[in-house]
Amino acid sequence: MAELQLDPAMAGLGGGGGSGVGDGGGPVRGPPSPRPAGPTPRGHGRPAAAVAQPLEPGPGPPERAGGGGAARWVRLNVGGTYFVTTRQTLGREPKSFLCRLCCQEDPELDSDKDETGAYLIDRDPTYFGPILNYLRHGKLIITKELAEEGVLEEAEFYNIASLVRLVKERIRDNENRTSQGPVKHVYRVLQCQEEELTQMVSTMSDGWKFEQLISIGSSYNYGNEDQAEFLCVVSRELNNSTNGIVIEPSEKAKILQERGSRM
C-alpha cells in the first residue's frame, strides 16, 4: 500500500481540528494551522497593544533672556491702581518700606496679594507717582495738581529719608518766598544832556538798572550847536527796609536823586 502524505496546508479542512485519512482509514490529526508570517497588511487586523512605560521628568520651560525673567518685575496695587516696576528700582532705598516688602520680604511686613499677585498697599495712588519716579531717577517732580505736604506724608510713610529732606527743603523755600511778598521796585527819572548820558549809564551801580531813555529835544543852544536833552528812567528793587529800620541810600544813589531833581 502506498504511503499517503498529508499536506500541512490542507490540515484544518473539515471543521474544528481539521481531519484527514490515514493508513487504516482512521482520522489523522495534523498540526495546527500556522499563522501567516510577516506584517499585517494596512487596514486589516488590530495593532499590537503598547506596553506603558514610566515617564522620566523632562527639562522645564526655558528661562527668559536676561537671567531673572519675570522675577525682576514687581506689581503693586496701591489703592486700586496698579504700578509695575523692578526690584532694582525699589532696592535703591534699602531701609524703605517698599524695599523691605518686595526685595527683602521682611516677615514683619505681612502684606496680602490680590488675584493677580500684586502687593496690596492701602495708600493714595495719586501721590505714589512722585514716590516711584524719585526711586527711578532720583529727582523730585511735583505737578501743580499735587500738594507738597501730601508728597511729604507719603515719603514719610514709605520711609524714604532722602526724599523727606528734599520735600522739606522745598516747602521751606516756598514759605520764605511767600513771607517776603511780591518784589517792589523804585523808579527814578533823570534828566541829562547827550554828553553826560554815556558816563551816567556806565557808572550806574548799587542795584540800579537802566529801564528807558526818552529824548526831549534840545533846550540849550551854544552857538550853532544844539545840546540834546534826555530823560533816563532807572529802577531798583525795594528791599532796603528790614524790621522797620530804613537803610540810608549810598552816595551814588544820592547823586542819581540829585540829578533827577533838576526836572
UniProtKB/Swiss-Prot annotation:
A GO molecular-function descriptor: protein-containing complex binding
Keyword Cytoplasm carried by entry: no
Cited Gene3D superfamilies: 3.30.70.2000, 6.10.140.750, Potassium Channel Kv1.1, Chain A (3.30.710.10)
A GO BP annotation: protein homooligomerization
UniProt KW keywords: Acetylation, Phosphoprotein
Record PTM N-acetylalanine, positions in chain: A2
Any single Gene Ontology cellular-component annotation: cytoplasm
Superkingdom assignment: Eukaryota
Biased composition (Gly residues): 12-28
SUPFAM superfamilies xref list: POZ domain (SSF54695)
Location of the BTB domain: 72-172
Sequence ranges of Low complexity compositional bias: 1-11
Regions of compositional bias (Pro residues) in chain numbering: 29-39
Record region (Disordered): 1-69
Phosphoserine sites (modified residues): S33
Entry-linked InterPro entries: BTB/POZ_dom (IPR000210), SKP1/BTB/POZ_sf (IPR011333), T1-type_BTB (IPR003131)
PANTHER family reported in the protein's UniProt record: BTB_POZ DOMAIN-CONTAINING PROTEIN KCTD2, POTASSIUM CHANNEL TETRAMERISATION DOMAIN CONTAINING PROTEIN
Protein's UniProt name: BTB/POZ domain-containing protein KCTD2
Species for this entry: Homo sapiens (Human)
Taxonomy of the source species: Eukaryota, Metazoa, Chordata, Craniata, Vertebrata
Chain's gene name: KCTD2
